[in-house]
């Protein structure tokens, strides 16, 4: 451990002298910088005819930093790695050895265990007395105030009083803020849910109100319609019909125009304009209960039905009496 600390101290000292970082010394970048600087100084001395001091002044490198860089060895990172690895191996070996020795050390169950005995004047085997907190029957909060006055420090009474009042004020403000935030969140979520439900009901009611309704009897007369359809089918297929019209010199039918035939599957409900020219919202009598129900108004007929259902659900269930067999006297 001492060798590693000594090497680290030397690295920190070199970093402070040369101006380079400690990471550059450990990784080896500082040695490449030292070699480049030494080659540049030698080039200035050889080619430029300058002295070493003049070359250092020209490159703006202090003499102490240059001396420290030139004194470095290129094998410093390998040496530092070897020292760190040796230290790690030694520490790890000692730690593992101590752990294994502690795990393999025999344990005996004859160690004495200290037992608390606070009732020495009474029965040593007697249990401790139960503690009951003091209850303020007369005035809530009086006992803590009296205890605070009794324990107050005369030399620092103002500091203690200010700390107590400040803490109480802060806790009250924090509690009030939390309750206010929770109330606002609940009210905002409730308002958002109500607004969403109202918007959905409004959109559905507007859709049904402005829709084009048609009355159709197709579901009730499905089988009769199929029967009449198959009865009215011609005996010739479309190819034979076109061949027959071609022989008779009549126009050949290419397709059946359904619009030209007097076949209607439904009757549209006529939409009446608002009376009086006030452009208010109107709805037919048969559609009015549906729209009012979407807005929350229940029609009297539905209301009575719902009340009957609620009464049936809320009414107490009558207990069924168990049938018991009558004991009939046996004939002797």
Curated annotation (Swiss-Prot):
A Pfam family reported for this protein in Swiss-Prot or TrEMBL: Polyoma_coat2
GO MF entry, a single one: DNA binding
Alphabetic keyword roster: Capsid protein, DNA-binding, Host endoplasmic reticulum, Host membrane, Host nucleus, Late protein, Lipoprotein, Membrane, Myristate, Viral penetration into host nucleus, Virion, Virus entry into host cell
Family matches, as InterPro entries: Polyoma_coat_VP2
Any single GO BP term: viral penetration into host nucleus
Residue interval(s) of motif Nuclear localization signal: 315-323
Sequence segments annotated as region (DNA-binding): 305-332
Cellular-component GO terms for this entry: host cell; host cell endoplasmic reticulum membrane; host cell nucleus; membrane; viral capsid
N-myristoyl glycine lipid sites: 2
Annotated region (D1), positions in chain: 265-300
Disordered, as annotated region: 306-332
Compositional bias segments (type: Basic residues): 318-332
Domain of life: Viruses
Family as reported in the entry's similarity comment: Belongs to the polyomaviruses capsid protein VP2 family.
Name the UniProt record assigns to this protein: Minor capsid protein VP2
Organism this protein belongs to: Squirrel monkey polyomavirus
Gene: VP2
């Amino acid at each position: 451990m001492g060798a590693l600390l000594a090497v680290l101290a030397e690295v920190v000292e070199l970093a402070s002298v040369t101006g380079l970082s400690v990471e550059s010394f450990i990784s080896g970048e500082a040695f490449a910088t030292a070699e480049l600087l030494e080659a540049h100084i030698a080039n200035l001395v050889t080619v430029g005819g300058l002295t070493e001091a003049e070359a250092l002044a020209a490159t703006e490198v202090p003499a102490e930093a240059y001396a420290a860089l030139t004194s470095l060895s290129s094998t410093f990172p390998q040496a530092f790695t070897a020292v760190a690895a040796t230290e790690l191996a030694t520490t790890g070996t000692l730690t593992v050895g101590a752990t294994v020795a502690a795990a393999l050390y025999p344990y005996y169950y004859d160690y004495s265990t200290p037992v608390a005995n606070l009732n020495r004047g009474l029965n040593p085997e007697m249990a401790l007395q139960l503690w009951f907190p003091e209850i303020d029957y007369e005035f809530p909060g009086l006992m803590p105030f009296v205890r605070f006055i009794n324990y107050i420090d005369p030399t620092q009474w103002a500091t203690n009083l200010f700390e107590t009042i400040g803490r109480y004020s802060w806790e009250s403000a924090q509690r009030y803020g939390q309750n206010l935030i929770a109330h606002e969140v609940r009210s905002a979520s409730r308002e958002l849910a109500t607004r969403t439900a109202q918007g959905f009901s409004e959109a559905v009611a507007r859709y049904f109100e402005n829709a084009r309704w048609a009355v159709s009897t197709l579901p009730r007369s499905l089988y009769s319609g199929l029967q009449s359809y198959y009865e009215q089918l011609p005996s010739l297929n479309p190819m034979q019909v076109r061949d027959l019209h071609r022989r008779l010199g009549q126009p050949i039918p290419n397709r059946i125009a359904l619009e030209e035939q007097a076949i209607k599957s439904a009757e549209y409900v006529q939409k009446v304009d608002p009376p009086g020219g006030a452009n208010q919202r109107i709805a037919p009598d048969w559609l009015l209960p549906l729209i009012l129900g979407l807005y929350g108004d229940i029609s009297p007929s539905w209301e009575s039905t719902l009340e009957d259902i609620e009464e049936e659900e809320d009414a107490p269930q009558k207990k069924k009496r168990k049938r018991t067999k009558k004991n009939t006297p046996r004939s002797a």
